[in-house]
A protein has these predicted regions:
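A short, glycine/small-residue-rich beta-strand->loop->alpha-helix junction that serves as a flexible
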Residues: 7-19
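Conserved nucleotide-sugar phosphate-binding/catalytic loop shared by glycosyltransferases and other
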Residues: 9, 27-85
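Short, polar loop motifs at secondary-structure junctions
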Residues: 37-43, 113-116, 174-179, 236-245
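Conserved nucleotide-sugar donor-binding subdomain of glycosyltransferases
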Residues: 72-108, 115-116
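A donor-sugar binding/catalytic signature common to diverse glycosyltransferases
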Residues: 109-112, 264-304
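Active-site-proximal region of nucleotide-activated glycan assembly enzymes
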Residues: 128-189
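Leloir-type glycosyltransferase catalytic cores
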Residues: 163-168, 314-332
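Donor-nucleotide binding loops and adjacent catalytic segments primarily
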Residues: 191-268
Length: 332
């Protein structure tokens, strides 16, 4: 079977899932003939993906999300304005996607939550069937729990999710745990897509806490938590750290962002502190490491992940770096 990928390039989650499925399909004897990755003028295809993906990678413009530069909070209004301003190049992108599909004639297009896919199939109707994969399709499941209130964010999330999957033959909803399918919504619930690099790790019972610190305010909160609990060993992977290891004191060390090293540390830690991105929480759960999930401000999707993760028993959630809450959650 010849497969063409279409991937949202925002963040690491969907790209990482695509790498995982690429590995699985190759091992099963199928041919992944290429990947179309949605990018913006400010964001190209990440090197970690292009270096690991063995088939041709084609970047195509797609409107991106807008985040507050200081707080990293999602800005829905600015995101909408940006999408309106880029309507003309977006239409060109849809025609590019349609032409690539019709020229390469794969047996199936697999769409990892990229709006280019849903809109191309809605407006230009390629002849090749499309299957969509993402945790976000759990939003169409009757058992999926959302934050109370926040009507605007809930509707925006569902509309955005629907725009990615117009014309799809089936929606594969990645889930923390086993759930029944939703045939009326074309939703089939499937396990998370984990990279071979994760499944090959051999976890041990560690004593240190591991934190992935990308939000600007999270490092400040980590330092405050460290002052309150100086006896707890913590390792923090921080986007502002340039050295592999930057020791603060005997129980706190910061590390430069390094995906391979982070996984190695995860396999040896006691628990992790991270944003509520689906992929990292799933990797921690697979390795038996409870998570303190801290959703990004105004990021409705991550707020949903945090609620769903707590329901599935993979960790606990907080709006801040609440070390006491994580300690109380850990088995005694």
């Amino acid at each position: 079977m010849r497969v063409l990928f279409l991937i949202q390039g925002e963040g690491r989650g969907h790209l990482t899932q695509a790498l995982s499925l690429h590995q699985m399909l190759k091992q099963a004897g199928h041919d992944v003939i290429g990947a179309i990755v949605g990018v913006t003028a400010e964001r190209d295809v990440p090197a970690f993906f292009s270096s690991a993906f063995t088939a041709p990678v084609t970047p195509i413009f797609s409107p991106g999300l807008v985040y507050n530069a200081k707080t990293n909070a999602l800005e829905p209004f600015k995101t909408t304005l940006k999408a309106i301003r880029t309507m003309r190049p977006f239409w060109r992108s849809l025609k590019q996607v349609r032409n690539m599909i019709e020229t390469q004639q794969p047996d199936v297009v697999v769409n990892f939550y990229e709006m280019l896919g849903g809109m191309t199939y809605a407006l230009l109707r390629p002849s090749v069937p499309m299957v969509c994969i993402a945790h976000q399709y759990m939003a169409f499941h009757t058992n999926f729990q959302c934050p109370k209130g926040q009507w605007f964010y809930r509707q925006a999330f569902k509309i955005n999710t629907r725009l990615t999957c117009f014309g799809a033959n089936e929606l594969l909803a990645l889930s923390f745990d086993k759930q029944p399918d939703e045939p009326s919504q074309r939703v089939r619930v499937v396990p998370p897509l984990l990279r071979q690099e994760v499944t090959e790790l051999k976890p041990i019972e560690g004593h240190s806490l591991l934190a992935y610190v990308t939000q600007p305010g999270l490092k400040v909160e980590l330092l405050k938590a460290h002052e309150q609990h100086p006896g707890i060993h913590m390792d923090g992977f921080h986007s502002g750290t340039t050295l592999p290891d930057q020791k603060v004191d005997d129980t706190l060390t910061f590390h430069a962002i390094d995906g391979k090293r982070f996984l190695e540390f995860m396999a040896q830690c006691k628990a992790i502190v991270t944003t509520a991105g689906f992929e990292s929480v799933c990797e921690a759960a697979y390795l038996g490491k409870p998570a303190l999930m801290i959703p990004q401000a105004n990021h409705y999707e991550q707020a949903c992940n945090a609620i769903d993760g707590q329901r599935a028993g993979v960790g606990t959630a907080s709006s801040r770096f609440d070390l006491d809450k994580l300690i109380d959650y850990l088995p005694k």
